[in-house]
A protein has these predicted regions:
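Residue-level detector of anion-binding/catalytic polar loops
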Residues: 33, 94, 108-110
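Acidic catalytic patch
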Residues: 15, 38, 59-90, 102-103
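Acidic, PIN/NYN-like endoribonuclease modules and their adjacent C-terminal/linker elements
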Residues: 1, 37, 73-74, 101-134
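Short glycine/serine- and small hydrophobic-enriched flexible loop segments
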Residues: 46-50, 105
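Short, well-structured N-terminal submotif of metal-dependent ribonuclease cores
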Residues: 1-36, 50-60, 133
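Acidic active-site catalytic centers that drive phospho-/nucleotidyl reactions
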Residues: 5, 97, 115
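Short, conserved active-site loops that position catalytic residues or coordinate cofactors/metal ions
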Residues: 38-46
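Alpha-helix capping/helix-boundary segments
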Residues: 8, 40, 80, 100, ...
Length: 134
């Protein structure tokens, strides 16, 4: 299972993003098992809707995330937050980024992100074009 962070979902809607094509494939191909955190919905709404003013697209994308992930849309719990805080301190991450890392590790999933500086460069995630499709 590929755990897609918000950056991947947003890249799948942005034709100008360098990861548009592989992100789009991950976001829409029903043959590829994907998951997301409930946090992802807020990050998508913030990144696409609040920051870029693309409210309708943000709502549509949140619906896609929820529909595409189904039961793979994970709720953040206290244990995940505890793990996330440990990872945040260890790797100099935000609690948000660390939550994705913690969830991927808990479930044995691959974290996919376009966040080169904070996640990919630290070998905590792979880019959409490097994700191993099952």
């Amino acid at each position: 299972v590929l755990l897609l962070d918000a950056s991947v979902w947003i890249a799948a809607k942005d034709r100008q993003d360098r990861y548009f094509d592989p992100a789009r494939t991950l976001a829409v191909d029903p043959a590829l098992p994907v998951a997301a955190l409930d946090l992802t919905l807020y990050e998508v709404a913030n990144g696409l809707g609040a920051r870029r003013g693309r409210h309708d697209e943000a709502i549509d994308l949140c619906r896609l995330v929820a529909g595409r992930c189904g039961e793979g849309l994970l709720a953040v719990d206290a244990k995940l937050i505890e793990s996330a805080l440990e990872l945040a301190a260890e790797h100099g991450l935000t609690a948000y980024d660390a939550a994705y890392v913690a969830a991927a590790r808990r479930h044995g999933w691959t974290l996919v992100s376009t966040d080169i500086a904070d996640l990919v460069s630290k070998d905590l995630a792979v880019t959409p074009d490097a994700a191993d499709y099952p």
